[in-house]
Amino acid sequence: MQQAPVVLSTLDKLLNWGRSNSLWPLTYGLACCAIEMMATGGSRFDFDRFGTIFRASPRQSDVMIIAGTLTKKHAEFMRRLYDQMPEPKWVISMGSCANTGGMFNTYATVQGADRIIPVDIYLPGCAPRPETLQYALMVLQDKIRRSKAIKQDAPKRLV
């Protein structure tokens, strides 16, 4: 097993620290869970202390929080927003409806956001409390800190 150079591992930690403490979620509220998501931005829960600022543009976001029931009409639009987000990007699926379709088992409902885009963290509940979303953000921060910021599988130059 080949070890990464000391300089790269230190740079890795620095990049991951910066990324984990500056998460900008894309607000993608679809139903009741969106109200709980908005509550986390209020003064009582204060998402800003984690370095988290809600963004309305996917080009300024690195986290997508899917909050609510996802219909098949919305699925294509959500995929397009996800594709517009810069790398690295993460997804939090918030609530039973976003996770599994919830109680809406119909032809028009997507039975889980992970059928459309990859999901990193699932929040159970109907609707999950703001504290749960804060905890999910802290779990995501830990996941980012443990990941490799610098990819070793970069294409090799021939010349």
Swiss-Prot record:
Residue ranges spanning the membrane: these are none
The residues listed in the UniProt record as binding [4Fe-4S] cluster, with positions renumbered to this chain, are C32, C33, C97, C126
Query: Which reaction is catalysed here?
Result: a quinone + NADH + 5 H(+)(in) = a quinol + NAD(+) + 4 H(+)(out)
Biological process terms in GO annotation: aerobic respiration; electron transport coupled proton transport
Subcellular location(s): the record lists: Cell inner membrane
What is the recorded membrane topology of this protein? Peripheral membrane protein
> Looking at its record, which EC class is this enzyme?
translocase
Pfam families (UniProt xref): Oxidored_q6 (PF01058)
The annotation note on the cofactor reads: Binds 1 [4Fe-4S] cluster.
Q: Which domain of life is it from?
A: Bacteria
Kindly list the cofactors needed: [4Fe-4S] cluster
List GO molecular-function terms, semicolon-separated. 4 iron, 4 sulfur cluster binding; iron ion binding; NADH dehydrogenase (ubiquinone) activity; NADH:ubiquinone reductase (non-electrogenic) activity; quinone binding
Question: What EC identifiers does the entry list?
Answer: 7.1.1.-
- The main place the protein resides is membrane
Keywords annotated in UniProt: 4Fe-4S, Cell inner membrane, Cell membrane, Iron, Iron-sulfur, Membrane, Metal-binding, NAD, Quinone, Translocase, Transport, Ubiquinone
UniProt lists the family membership as follows: Belongs to the complex I 20 kDa subunit family.
What is the recorded function of this protein according to its Swiss-Prot or TrEMBL entry? Answer: NDH-1 shuttles electrons from NADH, via FMN and iron-sulfur (Fe-S) centers, to quinones in the respiratory chain. The immediate electron acceptor for the enzyme in this species is believed to be ubiquinone. Couples the redox reaction to proton translocation (for every two electrons transferred, four hydrogen ions are translocated across the cytoplasmic membrane), and thus conserves the redox energy in a proton gradient.
Instruction: Please describe the quaternary structure of this protein.
Output: NDH-1 is composed of 14 different subunits. Subunits NuoB, C, D, E, F, and G constitute the peripheral sector of the complex.
Q: What is the designated name of this protein?
A: NADH-quinone oxidoreductase subunit B
